Amino acid sequence: MEIPFGGAKGALAIDPRKWEITELEQITRRFTQELAKRDLISPSQNVPAPDMGTGEREMAWIADEYRRLNPTDLNAWACVTGKPLGKGGIAGRTEATGRGVQYALQEFFRHEKDVAKSGLTATLADKRI
């Protein structure tokens, strides 16, 4: 399929609820510095996206720090997805994963043989996902 994204994950083993916002920003920026130092973040490779415990705010901090570290990179803001609209984000990003699941399920139920193999009936009625 040659899809240009996917495959890498990174994390910090912290509980963000236990830190002040200013501390979280410092931690996130330092994490970005460490990723950059190891050439593990750029608009053309290892593009982070929000996940558990992160969102638009953290993605904006990462993008801003990456841009600060790479002032000549014209595509610096593209080093992460999931930024707020005001920082180059895309409308609908928050809903994108759920929408992808919706489309995948619709496509799955179009193929009766696959539905039969799965042991499901041809509808989502009364099912939990």
Language model regions located:
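Conserved class I S-adenosyl-L-methionine
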Residues: 127-129
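N-terminal ligand-binding/catalytic initiation module
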Residues: 1-96, 100-104, 108-111
